[in-house]
């Protein structure tokens, strides 16, 4: 169950906040307006926003830390233009599936919990579009949420048995509107 009292929502980036696909330059960032409106609503409600994103392209040499920082600067800038604020972005640069920070492992989510002063992530939604996002949320004790943007529709269909009990929404804005209405 979602608990807005913890004042934190965590998101995957690719396919959730922007169109799916590998991004190697700020110009390639195609943000989803529904996601930006959802982030703005969270900001206006006093809820912090964190992002946890696998960025194995760094390990593969198709992206570097400086360019990734520029991509995230653009993400923050555009979110701000919509009235939203992204409090913290963490990423895993490793392509090693055993790396503790790389989803489906819970490391990035647990790091966000520590940063925001939470002893656990119970009730905190982690919104993603892939099975690894759901698995990371479950491993971290967060509430897994699947949005049907990016790879979400395919993930929902392909893994429907495993995702039977996972909250699912068409997009970020719809999810946020639902949670804020429930919390009112």
Predicted features, each with a name:
Residues 2-9, 65-88, 96-126, 130-184:
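Asp-based, Mg2+/Mn2+-dependent phosphohydrolase catalytic module
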Residues 2-50:
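Active-site neighborhood of HAD-like aspartate-dependent phosphohydrolases
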